[in-house]
Structure formats: structure tokens, C-alpha cells
């Protein structure tokens, strides 16, 4: 910033964009060299360093960091707290509002930014907007969950993105659309096989984040090598994310309702 140039306060819209990107970015990648941070900085006319700093400021409101005694940047604006408080209770709205703001700044439609080409054929109206919100929320959920786990399966460590799924702990169909469906704490990063097993209740987690395999899995036909590989993770702790720890209430729901005992 040139000497004598007045400091420009962050607007609500800019703060929403920074918070949405914060949610989609692992802590180790919150720095001025991150291409996505550079892209956002260019979009809003700021330096990548200032965007990275804003994201670090937002981290101080994260209750999970506070529980784990992880120190975030101690300073920030009142707007940071307002945005964090508002949208940490409505993840779907955070993801959607951020894409609306981004689209307006780029003079584009939301469908162009998040690759929603198949929705463009739906006539404008309430149904189309609801579909767009859902798809944008799914995009946000996947990015947030996978990045929180470092793009690795939390059970096996597989790190091929094409083989990874952002799995819902409490199933999407029965989750609240505002507080649960796109809440990254309702997600696990799993490979396709373990995602399916988790979805069908053949595996679950306990309160200590240990993997519990259902005895019903023994009825599944598989060769000895596959069985040994599948069962070796029983009672092992998952690799925990650097933020958005799996919510205990979501795990309890999966234990009680989904898991096959």
C-alpha cells in the first residue's frame, strides 16, 4: 500500500468470499502463494497477503480451534465476527451467497462459475433457484471436506481425488438443509468402497473416532486378501482433519440409526 493511501475496510461481501474460501482451504494452504487466494485477491482488488490475513483472522472465531488450543490471528474486524456467526449456522446460504457475489464481480451467472450447465435449461423460478442452491452446496461440501482431510481418505490414506468422496455422516436426505446438509463437520473423506460401506451401515465411528466394522460384514463374500485389508482398520482411529472435526451428534445419529449391529 502506497504511503498516504487510505486503508480500505473490508465489505460484508468481501468478508463472505473470504470466509467461504477459508472453509474450503486447509490451514497449511492459507498463504499468499495459494492460487485460489491469489484469484480472490485479484477479483476484489486486494493483495493475496491481505486475503490470507483475513482468512487467518476469521480462524480465531472457529470453536474447534479453540478446543484444540490452536492459536489463530488475534486481531480482526467486527464484520468478521458477524459473518462467521451468521453463516456458521447456515452453510448452504454461505456457499450460495458467496457464488452470487463472485458471479456479480465477474459479470457471469452462478451456473457458469460452478459448472451447473445442466440447470441452465430449467426455466427461471423458485425450483431452479432451489436446485442451484443444492448443487452449489454440494460443491462447497465436497471441497471443504476433502481439503480438511488433505485430500486423503481418512481410513486408508488413498489420495487420488477421483477415488474420494465427501461422505455424509448423517445422511443428506434426513439432514437439515441449513445447518447439516452442507456442514463440513457432517462429512468424512472416504474412498469409494468405504463410502459405500459407511452409507450402508457396515462401518461406523465411535465417540473416539475409531472405526467400528459391523459383524454383518463377515457375510460379504471376498477373497482373503481383501478381507484382511478391509478388517485391518477395525478399531483403528481415522486420520482427523485439520479443521471441521466430525460432529459428535452426527456420529451418534449414524451409530443409532444407520449402523447395522
Language-model features: locations:
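Short, Lys/Arg-enriched anionic-surface-contact patches
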Residues: 2-21, 132
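Short alpha-helical "recognition helix" segments of helix-turn-helix
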Residues: 36-41
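A detector for short metal-coordination/catalytic motifs
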Residues: 171-261
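Short Lys/Arg-enriched helix C-cap and helix-to-coil transition segments
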Residues: 63-84
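Major-groove recognition helix of helix-turn-helix-like DNA-binding domains
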Residues: 46-61
Amino acid at each position: 500500500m502506497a504511503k498516504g493511501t487510505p486503508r480500505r475496510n473490508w465489505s460484508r461481501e468481501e468478508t463472505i468470499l473470504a470466509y467461504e474460501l477459508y472453509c474450503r482451504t486447509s490451514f497449511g494452504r492459507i498463504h499468499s502463494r495459494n492460487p485460489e487466494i491469489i484469484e480472490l485477491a485479484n477479483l476484489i482488488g486486494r493483495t493475496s497477503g491481505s486475503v490470507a490475513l483475513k482468512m487467518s483472522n476469521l480462524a480465531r472465531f472457529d470453536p474447534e480451534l479453540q478446543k484444540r488450543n490452536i492459536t489463530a490471528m488475534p486481531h480482526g474486524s467486527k464484520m468478521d465476527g458477524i459473518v462467521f456467526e451468521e453463516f456458521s449456522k447456515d452453510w448452504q446460504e454461505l456457499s450460495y451467497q458467496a457464488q452470487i457475489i463472485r458471479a456479480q464481480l465477474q459479470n457471469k451467472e452462478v451456473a457458469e462459475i460452478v459448472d451447473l450447465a445442466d440447470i441452465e435449461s430449467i426455466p427461471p423460478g423458485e425450483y431452479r433457484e432451489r436446485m442451484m442452491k443444492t448443487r452449489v452446496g454440494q460443491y462447497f461440501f465436497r471441497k471443504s471436506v476433502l481439503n480438511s482431510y488433505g485430500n486423503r481418505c481418512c481410513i486408508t490414506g488413498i489420495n487420488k481425488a477421483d477415488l474420494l468422496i465427501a461422505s455424509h455422516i448423517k445422511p443428506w436426505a434426513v439432514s437439515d438443509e441449513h445447518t447439516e446438509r452442507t456442514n463440513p463437520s457432517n462429512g468424512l473423506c472416504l474412498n469409494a468402497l468405504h463410502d459405500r460401506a459407511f452409507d450402508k451401515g457396515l462401518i461406523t465411528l465411535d465417540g473416539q473416532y475409531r472405526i467400528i466394522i459391523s459383524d454383518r460384514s463377515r457375510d460379504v463374500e471376498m477373497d482373503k486378501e481383501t478381507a484382511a485389508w478391509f478388517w485391518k482398520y477395525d478399531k483403528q482411529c481415522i486420520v482427523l482433519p485439520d479443521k471441521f472435526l466430525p460432529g459428535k451428534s452426527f456420529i451418534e445419529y449414524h451409530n443409532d440409526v444407520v449402523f447395522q449391529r
